[in-house]
Design a protein with these regions (language model features):
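Bacterial N-terminal signal peptides
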Residues: 13-24
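Extracellular beta-propeller repeat domains
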Residues: 31-340
Length: 340
């Protein structure tokens, strides 16, 4: 496929997605008519969180942010920035590893589910890598032991890996269960509420990170790319689970960590920035080099906000973007949306 054909394919793909979202009611033309123009403005909504990676918008409209260091989920009021503890008592980050514990959180209805990683016995821990259902402020039920599944089902595509239980990064609700990315074993898993686990997509060393699901079964996924996280390896791809067709949507931003659709029907992503020269796989990017980017119809990115310090996850509430950083901040970005 030549460059012109590829650009046309991407443009048609975006237009079809947008039309389908409008038809389904996820985006309404009246909402689009009220979108703001202008340069995005950034402020710190909340700070002082510890070990922050994944986040989501809960059924009450608040932000829920994982704190791996503390083994808990924080609730952040998107208007005032007030922080309260939603759930505590989850496995904490192992000091010998430096990352892990709770890494993402989602809601199915009003029930929260937490993705936990790098806490198993192979790394010196005594907990289970997998999905935990929140039954109360400090009560949980493990619904899926993903670490054991990974031990029993190692990757079949050859690439170097050294954590056999995997590094679980992000999850999204999918058909009554979940899709989970493994940024170390380079695959996407399907997990049912009953704990059944299967591999729905397997890749070579592309480092899958954040993902979003639209129209029930179309997955948009961010790729961080292997060390040294070159810009051309930072990509958004799209696929249907269990399909061999994976389409590149956009590329050109280093170490992508999350992807979301905005209210304007455009696709946005977080770039953590260039990797640190000589750093080990899994290391964060260079400080203050992250960016909020928007995917264009020609397969490139437009950089909207730069110099973000180690962003990890992205959510939209109305016309506002909320960015969680590895340093424990929640940033609020106004005036993001533009027509195309």
């Amino acid at each position: 496929m030549n460059s012109r054909q590829r650009q046309l394919r991407i443009k048609v793909f975006f237009v079809l997605i947008l039309a389908a979202l409008i038809t389904a009611g996820s985006i309404r033309p009246a909402n689009c008519a009220s979108l703001k123009f202008g340069s995005p403005s950034v402020s710190v909504l909340a700070s002082g969180l510890q070990g922050t990676l994944g986040s989501t918008v809960g059924p009450d409209g608040a932000l829920y942010v994982v704190e791996g260091t503390l083994g808990q989920i924080a609730r952040v009021d998107p208007r005032t920035g007030k922080i309260s503890t939603f759930a505590s008592g989850l496995p904490q980050t192992l000091s010998s590893v430096g990352i892990g514990g709770p890494t993402d959180v989602v809601f199915v209805g009003r029930t929260a589910y937490v993705l936990v990683t790098l806490v198993s016995s192979d790394l010196g821990g005594n907990s289970i890598d997998g999905i935990y259902r929140v039954d109360g402020p400090n009560q949980f039920t493990i619904i899926a032991d993903i670490g054991q599944f990974n031990l029993n089902n190692p990757p079949t595509i050859p690439f170097p890996f050294f954590v056999d239980t995997g590094v679980l990064y992000a999850m999204q609700p999918y058909r009554g269960g979940f899709l989970v990315t493994d940024g170390h074993l380079n695959r996407v898993l399907s997990v049912t509420l009953g704990g059944k686990i299967s591999v729905v997509e397997a890749f070579d060393d592309i480092v899958p990170t954040g993902l979003t699901v639209v129209l029930g079964d179309i997955v948009f996924m961010a790729e961080a790319g292997p060390v040294p996280h070159l810009p051309q390896n930072g990509k958004i791809v799209a696929f249907r689970p269990n399909s061999s067709n994976v389409a590149e949507v956009a590329s050109g931003a280093s170490l992508l960590v999350d992807v979301k659709f905005g209210l304007d029907g455009r696709l946005y992503a977080l770039s953590q920035g260039p990797g640190v020269p000589g750093a080990a796989p899994g290391s964060p990017a260079q400080p203050n080099s992250g960016a909020l980017v928007r995917a264009n119809l020609d397969g490139t990115f437009t950089f909207l906000v730069d110099n973000i310090n180690l962003p990890t996850s992205l959510n939209f509430i109305g016309n506002t973007a909320y960015i969680v950083t590895l340093t424990g901040d929640v940033l609020k970005v106004n005036d993001v949306f533009h027509f195309f």
